[in-house]
């Protein structure tokens, strides 16, 4: 419903999870499988100037929360991807997004972390192996994109 109502999907994560953020955002802005209108999705992991300036001036823990503060509006969706479920910068982004009335979706590993506690919805992969968790995260990302293609494609 968020996309149908003109809201934006924001994604954040570190390392391989940052790559997943960029991959999922690209599938939404471009297309996944079905031809449909371009959808507003932004990976908060891509702007080198923002990433380095915020990290330098405020610390890496705020690299996503400062962007969320500036960009996210009530009703937007923030997807936080973290294999540990406790990445401090993703947790901070969730805290800021929650205060702004965003919908929070977490994608984590099996541990009960802060991201799972804060998320409205959390996909927890039942593994402690980083590679297996990341593989499941991109499959889940593709499933989300396929569902969105189906729903938005019907408009």
What are these regions (language model features)?
Residues 1-9:
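Glycine-rich phosphate/diphosphate-binding loops that line cofactor/substrate pockets in enzymes
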Residues 12, 17, 22-154:
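Glycine-rich phosphate-binding loops that contact phosphosugars or nucleotide phosphates
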